[in-house]
Swiss-Prot record:
Protein name: Ankyrin repeat domain-containing protein 16
Keyword Cell membrane: no
Organism listed in the record: Rattus norvegicus (Rat)
Sites marked Required to capture Ser that is misactivated by AARS/AlaRS: K111, K144, K174
Any Pfam family: Ank_2
Gene coding for it: Ankrd16
């Protein structure tokens, strides 16, 4: 049987919320138990019992450990998380309020410069966010990637939380990450329709604001398959459907890479985008991009929309070359079944010569043995 004060047993009692048993255990251990001896005994995180209590929402145990054993509410684990980070990240309001009431540092930084408010914004718990802000949390602080709390809330997509942050800090939307991505990019990428609506109504982002790669929120919405958001950006934000990124690729090309067939149909049939338009730098069409990524269904969709199956890039490589170079057997097979013949590129190489897998080689030559 484990001796009194055994770290594993104490941890279990805290997680299960067994305050009475925990109190009895520690009273038996008495002077033999040192709170600091617990640190590090529960794995590489270096958590204290306060971390466990805060993480699991055990406010009564949290108060007991602080008041009866004088445990340090600012104790950091190996990720520099304080108990307040744990309580905020899990949405345990009673623990958050207790720690703040005991004087916990509201904007303490964990690894990667995340504050408790940032972590609270990963949860749709407005009351916890309000408690932190009312105790002085700064929504404008940024983590190591350049994200502030509004950025994080935009990813989660709760318009009520976004509205609250804009009310208490009207300039919080004026932010970019280190790669120049705005909260509008983030909300569009993650398919948060109501959040995008809120951002367009309350904030003043430039139409087609670009990140370091030249990607616009419209491109983000399209390449992730969020057609309703793409329509919203077109109607309410005057987004440009043919804008190009830093490599000269349009939203159509990016949708081909990610295999977003519905978005491709919307662009071609709904907006009249040329299905064979080329990216400026690579001269790849959407069909070539899809073949390069092995997106067989998207290749089929593009062909059904009239894409030129014989299109080639600046090195005269066909879709078959790109599919074979990527060892995409199913895609290469579909292209051949659709009538695309093997041909030489500018170096004289055939698509078949780029294959390595037996499955693809057998499609070209049934006599190849497995």
């Amino acid at each position: 049987m484990a001796p009194p004060g055994d770290p594993r047993r104490l941890c279990r009692l805290v997680q299960e919320g067994q305050l009475r048993a925990l109190r009895e255990e520690l009273e038996v251990a008495g002077g033999c138990w040192d709170p600091e001896m617990f640190r590090g005994s529960q794995g590489p995180a270096g958590d204290t019992l306060l971390h466990f209590a805060s993480r699991h929402g055990r406010q009564d145990i949290l108060a007991y450990l602080v008041e009866a054993w004088s445990m340090d509410i600012e104790a950091a684990n190996r990720d520099y998380k304080r108990p307040l980070h744990e309580a905020a990240s899990m949405g345990h309001r009673d623990c958050v309020r207790y720690l703040l009431g005991r004087g916990a540092v509201v904007d303490s930084l964990k690894k990667a410069d995340w504050t408790p408010l940032m972590m609270a914004c990963t949860r749709k718990n407005l009351e916890v966010i309000q408690d932190l802000v009312e105790h002085g949390a700064n929504p404008l602080l940024k983590n190591k990637d350049g994200w502030n709390s509004f950025h994080i809330a935009s990813r989660e997509g709760d318009p009520v939380i976004l509205r609250y942050l804009l009310t208490v800090c009207p300039d919080v939307w004026k932010t970019e990450s280190k790669i120049r991505r705005t909260p509008l990019h983030t909300a569009a990428m993650h398919g948060c329709f109501e959040a995008v609506q809120e951002l367009l109504e309350r904030c003043h982002y430039e139409p087609d604001c670009r990140d370091n790669c030249g990607v616009t929120p419209f491109m983000d919405a399209i390449q992730c398959g969020h057609v309703s958001i793409a329509k919203l950006l077109l109607e309410n934000h005057e987004a440009c459907s043919s804008a190009t990124d830093s490599l000269g690729a349009q939203a159509l090309h990016r949708a081909a890479v990610t295999g977003q067939d519905e978005a491709i149909r919307f662009l071609v049939c709904g907006l009249g985008i040329d299905v064979d338009v080329r990216a400026k730098s690579s001269q790849l069409t959407a069909l070539l991009y899809a073949a390069k990524e092995g997106q067989t269904s998207t290749v089929q969709t593009l062909l059904s929309l009239g894409a030129d199956i014989n299109s080639t890039d600046e090195r005269n490589r066909s879709a078959l070359h790109l599919a074979c170079a990527g060892q995409h057997a199913a895609c290469a097979r579909f292209l051949r079944q659709s009538g695309l013949k093997d041909s030489a590129d500018l170096t004289g190489a055939l698509a078949q010569q780029l294959t390595r897998g037996v499955a693809i080689l057998q499609d070209f030559d049934p006599g190849v043995k497995s």
